[in-house]
UniProtKB/Swiss-Prot annotation:
SUPFAM superfamilies from the UniProt entry: Thioredoxin-like
UniProt xrefs under Pfam families: Sep15_SelM
Name of the featured protein: Selenoprotein M
Gene symbol of the encoding locus: Selenom
Physiological role: May function as a thiol-disulfide oxidoreductase that participates in disulfide bond formation.
Keywords: Selenocysteine, Signal
Linked residues for Cysteinyl-selenocysteine (Cys-Sec): C35-U38
Family note: Belongs to the selenoprotein M/F family.
Species for this entry: Danio rerio
Length: 151
């Protein structure tokens, strides 16, 4: 009897995505790649997520690819792919829970503004900000160095 129960539960255990922090260091944004047609219509939970929930997430976009199975593509600041997560077998609640675990900010309404502390979420900060601030900072000279002694 136990082998039968184990065999029945194995697919659900395999399909659950576990967040690997080391693999996803540098996670900054994501996109959902899926077809827009009949294949998505057969997956009610995923279609509900795509049509109703994606507009609520900051730094999450949708890309239509004809014939593609729905996948969540995790990207870093340079749009380099970190991981792909198949969404076909997941429920809407599981997808939303996964995005929350990954640190994505979900707005209440699509037109709501993103609070400043979540501007870069799921990333903690921007790698470009330190470069911009150091490049924009003018070099200061000591007043004693700028005085002419020959006058």
């Amino acid at each position: 009897m136990w082998p039968l129960i184990f065999t029945a539960l194995l697919p659900s255990v395999i399909l659950t995505y576990e967040v690997n922090i080391e693999k996803l260091s540098g996670l900054a944004r994501a996109r959902v790649e899926t077809c827009g047609g009949u294949q998505l219509n057969r997956m009610r939970e995923v279609k509900a997520f795509v049509t109703q929930d994606i507009p609520l997430y900051h730094n999450l976009v949708m890309k239509h690819i004809p014939g593609a199975d729905p996948e969540l593509v995790l990207l870093n600041h340079y749009y380099e792919e970190l991981d792909r997560i198949p969404l076909s077998e997941m429920t809407r609640a599981e997808i939303n829970k996964l995005l929350a675990e990954l640190g994505f900010y979900k707005k209440g309404h699509p037109e709501d503004q993103v609070p400043e502390e979540f501007r870069f979420s799921p990333a903690k900060d921007s790698p470009f900000e330190s470069r911009l601030s150091s490049a924009a900072a003018p070099e200061t000279t000591e007043p004693s160095d700028s005085q002419h002694t020959d006058l």
